[in-house]
Amino acid sequence: MTEADPIRVILVDDHAMLRKGLRFFLAGFDDLELVGEAASGKEAIRLCVELVPDVVLMDMVMPDMDGAAATQIIRQQTPTVEVIALTSFQEEDLIERALQAGAISYLLKNVSAETLAEAIRQAHAGHSTLAPEATEVLVKATRQRAGQHDYGLT
């Protein structure tokens, strides 16, 4: 890939209207190219193997196969592909499952276009982006777990 080549992106969401909106959003950035869309985790895996995109925008809650399961398989089969979890949910277990499955970033669907574009660029460069809400959930959970342990420190 040369400096002028756009970042190749696949959208994965079971809601056609959301994919349409993201398609429109991506068209506004010269450095981002939509190369495929999937409505399910299984379809996403097939597309990633076939097209080997740079970045996948992955919904986490879908019927049939959820985004975390699809992310794990995509990362195993195409390890150069970075996955951004893009969801409406900010529950601790979902955030942890997405990151443990191999997602490099976790964003909420209310993210601004500029923030999402920058997160795609950062993911392509190997850097993480977490929604502030996700960061807050993880910090609270970690602090709660730390408070449950007596480390014998004085």
Question: What is the predicted role of each segment?
Answer:
Residues 40-43, 65-69:
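Acidic catalytic/metal-coordinating carboxylates
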Residues 62:
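Receiver (REC) domain active-site loop signature in two-component systems and cognate sites
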Residues 59, 87:
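Active-site residues of response regulator receiver
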Residues 93-100, 104-153:
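Short, flexible helix-to-coil linker/hinge segments that flank and couple to helix-turn-helix
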Residues 46, 68-80:
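Short amphipathic alpha-helix used as the core "switch/output" element in two-component signaling
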Residues 5-18, 22-26:
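Conserved acidic segment of CheY-like receiver
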